[in-house]
Curated annotation (Swiss-Prot):
Reaction(s) this enzyme catalyzes, per UniProt: thiamine + ATP = thiamine phosphate + ADP + H(+)
InterPro entries: Aminoglycoside_PTrfase (IPR002575), Kinase-like_dom_sf (IPR011009), Thiamine_kinase (IPR014093)
Protein name in the entry: Thiamine kinase
GO biological process: thiamine diphosphate biosynthetic process; thiamine metabolic process
Amino acid sequence: MPFRSNNPITRDELLSRFFPQYHPVTTFNSGLSGGSFLIEHQGQRFVVRQPHDPDAPQSAFLRQYRALSQLPACIAPKPHLYLRDWMVVDYLPGAVKTYLPDTNELAGLLYYLHQQPRFGWRITLLPLLELYWQQSDPARRTVGWLRMLKRLRKAREPRPLRLSPLHMDVHAGNLVHSASGLKLIDWEYAGDGDIALELAAVWVENTEQHRQLVNDYATRAKIYPAQLWRQVRRWFPWLLMLKAGWFEYRWRQTGDQQFIRLADDTWRQLLIKQ
């Protein structure tokens, strides 16, 4: 149920107008990008979400709502309300673990997602890389960062192997192990893109796990594993730059020291992989 309004409302106004019988249960963090809170009434629970990035355009939040509206409930929470700065979605019962599931199970989830109809908007990384450069702390901008940005701009993004709807933030904290199977939460970066980009972006523990995930996916997608792995590797520099830039951007935005540590670690990975 989308609800259009140019006037922002408070949390209490949201609850009193749309969920008068519900009460907040708890606030929880669902990843590095922000928090949400639960509301409940007679055992029924919803998650109330706000944009993780207060500086992002409103269209980005609306896209997340549209993505959730068209995804099947077996892999994503269904949305119930959207209005400026607020979204209410189903609460997904289950366990959120600190490690990834079996690679074959995860490959099955991603392959099923990639078989769904496209969202209708493309994921393009270069504008994000340039935005993070421009919005980062000037003292943190280095010659090496600018050189890599220019190199990627000249090279252009890899041509997609297969174009599909992507989640683009697959890590242990965004996977719910439910009684009916794996489900994904936090769809704020969703869009259409290369399946290899999704696979490259998964937050794996090591290269061995990454290759096994790609192999399991290739079996389902009927792609030569070596061909898919080559395409995944083409995306590595783009994704490392994306992560490093996002951490730098969030550091300037929040002042949270964890983002500096994560940025420094990602820059080191970039140097190793060059």
